[in-house]
Structure formats: C-alpha cells, structure tokens
Amino acid sequence: VLGNVLVVFPAVLALAALIALATGHPAISEKQAEHVFESLHLLGPSLFFAAFTGVLLFASSIIAGWTENWFVLHRMDSALHYNPRITGLLGAERAARWARFLRENLSGFAANISLGFMLGLVPAFAAFFGLGLDVRHVTLSTGQVAAAGATLGLQVLQLPAFWWAVASLPFLGALNVSVSFYLAFSLALRAQNVSGVDRSRIYAAIRARLRTAPLSFFVPERRGPLATTAQG
C-alpha cells in the first residue's frame, strides 16, 4: 500500500505536468480539482466508501482464487504446454514458458482486472439505482489528489481542503486493507474449521502484532538471502 502511494503521487504529478506542457491546459479543470478535495474530505463519507472498497478488494481476491482453481482443475498449463497447435505456433520451449507464466500470474491478472471493473462499474450501477454509493481506493485517491494539486499549483498548500484530503489518505488505506483482510481472514477460519479457542489465540497474536509492529501490516518485511537460507 505504502509503496503504491509513494509511486503514484509523483508519477501523477509528472504526467499532469506533461499533459499541461503538451496541450497548454491542465489535466483537470480547477472546478474538478476543488471537487476532488471536497469528495475526499476526511469528515465526509469517504471513510464509509473506503470500507466498502475493502469489500470489493475481498471480492476480487475471491475471483482470483476461483480463476486459479479453474486453471489448475482443468490442467490448463499442461494443455497450453502440450497442445499441438500452440506448440506448432509458438514452439515447445516458448509454449512451456507461457504455460508456466500463466500458472504463476493468472490469479494476479484476475484480481486486478476484476477489481478494475468493479471500481469503475459499481459506482455507475449504484448511481443508476439512486444509492449514492462510491468507491475510495487509496491508490486512486492519491492520484486524484496529485492531479488536483498539479492543477492548482503551489497555492494548493494554502487550502484547508487540500490538507483535509491528504489527511484522509492514511485512513482510506487502513480501511481498504483492514476490511479486506478481516473478510479474507474470517473466510479462512471457516474454511479451516478453526475452533473458538484457537480463534482467540489468533486474535490475541494479531493484537500483539498491532501493538509491537503496526507498520508490518502495511510495509512488507525485508528478507535477505540469510533469512531465506535460515528458513530453508
């Protein structure tokens, strides 16, 4: 999460600068920039929308799991590897590489593609039915803040609305991650038929980890060659 945010913000700033340089106009208008800050205000409905986005993240992981299970169940990697037409077109070695690549990365493709569709279509369907439901993905919201800031220039630093939007970003990320993690964790406990006593121990371990190393839930641990060798 943190890595995505740190990459997206300067990348969007650079892209907005290129668009302004090439077209002579900012990537988004000043009115749109002001609307971005209003929609991401910390005291608005953004936190609720971020929690709902966590549900969509969980749903995309379910779709990814289904896709990978289907791929493995039907032995699609073997079908791609040994299919005469595919091997005749690509060659045996290249067909094997494609089969291995899809076996290792198909779930990631399914998760990202399905999440993209849901982030784009769910608000549209919700608006059609008059639900007023929106999504707040921390990475996309960070990009919106960067684009709006690029439009308004340095004067944006003097706007309280900008700082309210920036302040909301950590909470959006925390809700995205925590809601999707909770749903995935609950599903895993049910799938493994974990008893109530064992669940209490697991919850206690998670709370202890939150107290001692809260950033580990957002920033992955670095594992060097020595740690990998020791575990092996």
Predicted regions and their residues:
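Hydrophobic alpha-helical transmembrane segments of multipass membrane transporters and ion channels
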Residues: 2-7, 11, 52, 110, ...
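Hydrophobic alpha-helical transmembrane segments and adjacent short intramembrane/lumenal linkers
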Residues: 1, 43, 105-106
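Catalytic or ion-translocation cores adjacent to nucleophile or general acid/base/metal-coordination motifs
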Residues: 6-90, 132-151
